[in-house]
């Protein structure tokens, strides 16, 4: 456990599904001496893939946090999932990292998912270095990959190494700063033993490329300061230290991204990459004090110094269920220190919590520690009310750190226990799983009485159901996936009058409202706005929130097919009340009924989620792929030629309802050679024929 924060790195490893993130992490752990046996993803033995499903599917779903040491530095690594259904995991870990290693597949270059994750990292300004992996693969092309970093990500790569040999003959790299070649000879099986790297001088073969890339690198570094620029222009050589300092500055400011290469699986190029993590990625102090706001006032900005002496503050960024300890809460400590048994304030929820045991995690092995200190990542036991995104702090110095925003689910399944005995287990399971992943939403459908789970995609929900059966031993029936439709209005309706009155002996009920409704033009943002334009006290102030609440009640069920309403602005214009008979309840009912009447007149429509789909296919199947997407009501955006291997890329917007079972159809149409990815794009109006079908279905059930 290092206390000198200059020597600490909190990093994530981010990439596309199969670019080799987990293998890269495993190699980090192997080289830093934490792991004595190598785990391979395709054997299901990787240390960071610790849930059973991950081992089976060979993909990483939850970000495991792992600590290791290299060259007298402590590296806390978070392994991120690369599958698009698990964006929340990536988003979460990026929020608490100081830097990241972006792993690219040397053959594929920047893939759709790498792009999504890269944009998420841009959102949080995370400094990154790039590792072009799988250089030993057939068709691997380092220069093509660097080119895609520029073209697809619009980023500025700093090439730090060039590969020696390609595909099966890939043996090592040339370091462009020291101009030395690092070669990992390996035996006949390509097995490279621990620490067996040695240096040889530059060879004649690649001089031209080396010279070009080294000049580019030196020029980029020279631009970081006037002194270096002068030195460079006068033709003086920059020293190795100057170049490294310049690269570090560009990296920490996220102005450029150093690029390294290797094959993690074949153990080539891993050590220089670890050196680069230490040399170029920021330490917890580089980002400066962490900012937050006062508990009751978002306008009041507060800061906490990154030091042990400052008041304690931390962000809970992940909840995991552990087989023995129950709930583990992963926290990033931004300031101060804390011992186990201490009391903290959950400032987000306004509740006090007591810290139980404290651990530094190594995938799913725990190393107990007595205290936590600023700049590190830990797992805590004993927190009852804390969920993802909550701030924990010193009760005497409350602060709320910037939290995370999570997308709304686009797909849901109905779930019901098979037996009465499963009912209780089911609700416990759902509670725990939702605490772990905030993009799962649980909803009790009042009409059908079923519990519905919403998520980010089919795989996301599959894993949920799978874990429920395995970890919580719940037997449940799972319905077919349902699309999360929404309803809205197309035109403005002025002055909708509604009077609610009841006279039944004793005190009656009376409320009169006049409202106008109009569509809000926000493809993603605001769901609803309410404005009060009543003047002169025609309706007393205290009843206005009830009108608003009544409208929101009615918005839960649209008038066409009962889906939630979105993108509506309501304005209350006028009304009347009665001294004795008016009540909050009466105005709530009036607001609700006026809304239902108004919506019917405002051309109600149904909206459906559109997905941005990207298909990569060999050229000969291009026609079939496009025809198939068209038959699914897809709008083809662009078709483009890809790399030298002749792969074509098709981008389309396709309704989610048409994408069920797509993977099977795509495989059979392209002999399993095409791949696709999809992310939520926006909500759009459903064509009339489809809308009629949806309405009929909802009434027929």
UniProtKB/Swiss-Prot annotation:
Native source species: Micrococcus luteus (Micrococcus lysodeikticus)
Identification of the protein by name: Elongation factor G
Domain tr-type G: 6-285
Keyword Lipid biosynthesis belongs to the record: no
GO cellular component: cytoplasm
SUPFAM superfamilies: EF-G C-terminal domain-like (SSF54980), P-loop containing nucleoside triphosphate hydrolases (SSF52540), Ribosomal protein S5 domain 2-like (SSF54211), Translation proteins (SSF50447)
Gene Ontology terms: biological process: ribosome disassembly
Cell compartment(s), UniProt: Cytoplasm
MF terms (GO), sorted A to Z: GTP binding; GTPase activity; translation elongation factor activity
């Amino acid at each position: 456990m290092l206390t000198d924060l200059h020597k600490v790195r909190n990093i994530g490893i981010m990439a596309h599904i199969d670019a080799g993130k987990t293998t890269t992490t495993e190699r980090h752990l192997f080289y830093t001496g934490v792991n004595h046996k190598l785990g391979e993803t395709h054997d299901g033995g990787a240390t960071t893939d610790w849930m059973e499903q991950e081992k089976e599917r060979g993909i990483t779903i939850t970000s495991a946090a792992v600590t290791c040491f290299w060259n007298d530095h402590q590296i806390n690594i978070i392994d991120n999932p690369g599958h698009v259904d698990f964006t929340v995991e990536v988003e979460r870990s990026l929020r608490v990292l100081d830097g990241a290693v972006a792993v690219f597949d040397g053959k594929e270059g920047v893939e759709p998912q790498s792009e999504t994750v890269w944009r998420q990292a841009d959102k949080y300004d995370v400094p990154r270095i790039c590792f072009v992996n799988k250089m030993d693969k057939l068709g691997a092309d380092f220069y093509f990959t660097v080119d895609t970093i520029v073209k697809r990500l619009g980023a500025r790569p700093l090439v730090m190494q060039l590969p020696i040999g390609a595909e099966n003959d890939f043996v090592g790299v040339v370091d462009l700063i020291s101009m030395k070649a690092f070669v990992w000879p390996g035996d006949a099986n390509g097995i490279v033993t621990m620490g067996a790297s040695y240096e040889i001088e530059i060879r004649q073969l690649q001089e031209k490329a080396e010279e070009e890339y080294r000049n580019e690198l030196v020029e980029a570094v020279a631009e970081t300061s006037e002194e270096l620029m002068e030195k460079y222009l006068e033709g003086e050589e920059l020293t190795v230290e100057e170049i490294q300092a310049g690269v570090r500055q560009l990296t920490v400011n996220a102005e450029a991204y150093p690029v390294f290469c290797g094959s993690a699986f074949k153990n080539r190029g891993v050590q220089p990459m670890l050196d680069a993590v230490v040399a170029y990625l920021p330490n917890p102090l580089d980002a400066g004090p962490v900012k937050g706001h006062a508990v009751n006032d978002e306008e009041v900005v507060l800061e906490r110094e990154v030091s042990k002496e400052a008041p304690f503050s931390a962000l809970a960024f992940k909840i995991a269920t552990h087989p023995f300890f129950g709930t583990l809460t992963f926290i990033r400590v931004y300031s101060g220190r804390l011992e186990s048994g201490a009391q903290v304030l959950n400032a987000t929820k306004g509740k006090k919590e007591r810290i139980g045991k404290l651990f530094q995690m190594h995938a799913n092995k725990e190393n107990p520690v007595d205290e936590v200190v600023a700049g590190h990542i830990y797992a805590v036991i004993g927190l009852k009310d804390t969920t993802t995104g909550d701030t924990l702090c010193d009760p005497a110095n409350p602060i709320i750190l910037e939290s995370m925003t999570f997308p709304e689910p686009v797909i849901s399944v109905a779930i019901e226990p098979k037996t009465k005995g499963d009912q209780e287990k089911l609700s416990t399971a759902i509670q725990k799983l939702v605490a772990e992943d905030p993009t799962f939403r649980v909803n009790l459908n009042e009409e059908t009485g079923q519990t519905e789970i919403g998520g980010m995609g089919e795989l996301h929900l599959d894993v949920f159901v799978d874990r429920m059966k395995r970890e919580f031993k719940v037997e449940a029936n799972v319905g077919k996936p349902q699309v999360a439709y929404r309803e809205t209005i197309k035109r403005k309706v002025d002055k909708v009058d509604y009077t609610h009155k009841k006279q039944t002996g004793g005190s009656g009920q009376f409320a009169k409202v006049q409202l106008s409704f109009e569509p809000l033009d926000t493809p993603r943002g605001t769901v609803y706005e309410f404005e009060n334009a009543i003047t002169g006290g025609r309706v007393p102030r205290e009843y206005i929130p009830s009108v608003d609440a009544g409208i929101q009640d009615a918005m839960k069920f649209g008038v066409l097919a009962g889906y939630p309403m979105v993108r509506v602005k309501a304005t209350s214009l006028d009304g009347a009340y009665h001294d004795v008979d008016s009540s909050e309840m009466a105005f709530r009912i009036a607001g609700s009924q006026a809304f239902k009447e108004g919506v019917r007149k405002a051309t109600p429509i149904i909206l459906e989620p559109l997905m941005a789909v990207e298909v990569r296919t060999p050229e000969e199947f291009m026609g079939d792929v496009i025809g198939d997407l068209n038959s699914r009501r897809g709008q083809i955006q662009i078709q483009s030629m890809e790399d030298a291997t002749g792969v074509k890329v098709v981008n389309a917007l396709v309704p989610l309802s048409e994408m069920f079972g797509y993977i099977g159809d795509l495989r059979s149409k392209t002999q399993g050679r095409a791949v696709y990815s999809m992310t939520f794009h926006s909500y759009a109006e459903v064509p009339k024929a489809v809308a009629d079908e949806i309405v009929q279905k909802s009434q027929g059930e």
